[in-house]
Amino acid sequence: MPLLKLVFLGTGGAVPKSDRMLPTIYLEDWLGHRVLLDAGEGAQYRLLQIDVSPASLTLVAITHQHEDHTLGLPGLVITNKFLGGKLKVLAPRSMHKILERLGVEVSDSYEEGRFKITCVEVCHTVDACGWLFQWDVGYKLDLSKVAGLPKWALTNLIRGEAVKVGGRLITPEEVADLTHKRFRRLLYTGDTAPCPQMWKTVGEVDVLIHEATFADDVEPQKAHDEGHSTVADAVEAAKTLKADVLILTHISARYPSKERHKALADAVKPPPHIYIPDDFDTLLIKL
């Protein structure tokens, strides 16, 4: 079953609070990939608190160079070196040279089998990547079109491979259930102002993790000039991207609680279904 596990190790932004640390999200998929989205201060300690070894990470995906997103990275690098490994890091190209000097394997994309991560340019005050995850979950077959085919043929068709049965070449597209989505997608924006050009590049996603630094008490233009978004901006992005699930994070330390954000989110009729996690909250999502 295509199932994602998200653990929110840090849901704040810029300045930490006792109950809201800096941006760090742990993602684990049903295929066994373990990805850390940004590495706020104390990232590896927080991983250990959820019984995840820093050495077990597939990679760390950093959105941009600002310290609230990167202060936890040196510790992860050092720990991996001590354990005989080499950390893989995805980052904007402007960060590659300095990361290479740290001795990490750095890139701006990752692909393994049916899983890939790519950088999409977001609208922040520095060079920044949103990270677009895509999983190929295979085809769902229209049973009326595959009746009588052998099991091996069905397996190959689900994987996206054409088969030859009784001299007839059958492609997955011919026998697919067209109501089923083959690709499932998640986008993590990191820090961004509203970014229509990014929305156009991405198209559609199933899950959107979008920053909502501000609620509704800051002039939208002020938020945008600082490279950030409001709750309303994040909701608009989710609707444009046709996301089923919207997760709001990177909450400013100016807010003593998330109640103001929650009130705004509660006023939105699904879709999207909106979640505003606390630190250490776990969310399981069936794709």
Curated annotation (Swiss-Prot):
Family matches, as SUPFAM superfamilies = Metallo-hydrolase/oxidoreductase (SSF56281)
Classify the source by domain of life: Archaea
Major enzyme class: hydrolase
Q: Which cofactor does it need?
A: Zn(2+)
Asked if the record carries the keyword tRNA processing, the reply is: yes
Q: Which residues form the active site?
A: 68
The record lists the lineage as:
Archaea, Thermoproteota, Thermoprotei, Thermoproteales, Thermoproteaceae
Q: Has the keyword Manganese been applied to this entry?
A: no
| Designated name of the protein | Ribonuclease Z
**This protein's encoding gene:** rnz
- According to the record, how does the cofactor bind? Binds 2 Zn(2+) ions.
Keyword entries, A-Z: Endonuclease, Hydrolase, Metal-binding, Nuclease, tRNA processing, Zinc
* Cited Gene3D superfamilies: Ribonuclease Z/Hydroxyacylglutathione hydrolase-like
Q: Which GO terms describe its molecular function?
A: 3'-tRNA processing endoribonuclease activity; zinc ion binding
Alphabetized PANTHER family for the sequence = ZINC PHOSPHODIESTERASE ELAC PROTEIN 1
- Subunit note: Homodimer.
Question: Entry's HAMAP family?
Answer: RNase_Z_BN
**What does the UniProt record say this protein does?**
Zinc phosphodiesterase, which displays some tRNA 3'-processing endonuclease activity. Probably involved in tRNA maturation, by removing a 3'-trailer from precursor tRNA.
Q: Which organism is it from?
A: Pyrobaculum islandicum (strain DSM 4184 / JCM 9189 / GEO3)
Q: Which reaction(s) does its UniProt entry say it catalyses?
A: Endonucleolytic cleavage of RNA, removing extra 3' nucleotides from tRNA precursor, generating 3' termini of tRNAs. A 3'-hydroxy group is left at the tRNA terminus and a 5'-phosphoryl group is left at the trailer molecule
Task: Quote the Pfam families the UniProt record gives.
Answer: Lactamase_B_2
